[in-house]
Amino acid sequence: MKRINIVFVALLALICVAPAGAQEKHKWLEYVRPSGSLQGGVSFDPQEMDYQFYVRRARVAVLGTVLNNPRYGKLEYVVRASLVQSPSLLDGFIKYTLRDEFGVQFGQFRSPVNLENTELSSTTIELIDYSLVTQRFCHLGSLDLEGINASGRDIGINFYGKFLKMSDGHHLIRYDVGIFNGAGINRRDDDQRKHYMARLMVYPLKELSIVGYYSRVLGPHPDIAPEYNVYDWYVYDRYGGGVYYKSKYGWFRGEYMEGHTHGYLARGAYATLGYFILPELDASARYDYFVTDTSRPSSTTQHLITVGARWKPLSFFYAQLNYTCNFAPSSVQPTHLVNLQTSLVF
């Protein structure tokens, strides 16, 4: 905790110092760019006639480009902290891109398990919540199947790149290959397991991406005593794919994932459809389903239907209004939730 507090104080100091000196502003912003976000709102349960206010996220970050040279490549860093409940480090990594075809990222950052986890941040995703697939399979929040709840992040190293530049400037192929501790954030590796990930994204059009991914944890099973020198080198895996199309008129995104967790096979999918009504106003709808244990589908299947609108009158402020109908396996009747969330981004 002492280290986290030091990081938090350092972030605030950099944010305060960075704007100083008008003549040095552009130089500062190249090496040290402060940013942050604050998200909160109110949720209402019409069945219980109950509502509650909440602060969901409060984050500050410092990022910058240390090197940007056509010959020697590009070196970037990001340090991001969460201030909700107690200060904690979310992101802390360096990213070196030697050329388009090869780069390496090292530290604590969002792991490339699927599409939604890395391509959409908490301030750019169209609806308030991530899909069930992302929450349960990608260590994102309290619904995580493994109970790690690491905000979709992990500590490790990732190699990435893109190939075959097209006439309109986009690249046809993009890849990620990484090795992670698999223990979550702000923690040393507490076992001998490692999380291996691979993801391939193909862009037939600039607006269209098709993705496939596979990840697997290898190492001794925690339930097997190491003194017997007996290892179960297959603990769990994740695999799936998806598609994402976005144009000036709207977007469509869908993914399917499945995988084993401690002997149980789970699977899920989602589909999101959205339309830009005005430049500052859009509407979207999403269908989710998730089966926690495919051997007991009738008692472990959950369906969600979410519709929402997002209004962004200012570049640094937007509001989201969502309605969710939840068909949970433990409920005889579906539950309903109305959620209004506002966001400040700087």
Label each region the model flagged.
Residues 1-8:
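Bacterial N-terminal signal peptides that target proteins for export
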Residues 9-16:
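Bacterial N-terminal signal peptides
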Residues 18-22:
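Sec/Tat signal peptide C-region and signal peptidase I cleavage site
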Residues 24-181, 192-194, 201-209, 272-275, ...:
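Outer membrane beta-barrel
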Residues 46-52, 79-89, 117, 185-192, ...:
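Solvent-exposed loop/turn segments connecting transmembrane beta-strands
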Residues 201-294:
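Detector for outer-membrane/organellar transmembrane beta-barrel domains
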Residues 274, 280-320:
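Outer membrane beta-barrel transmembrane domains
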Residues 311, 334-346:
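Outer-membrane beta-barrel "beta-signal"
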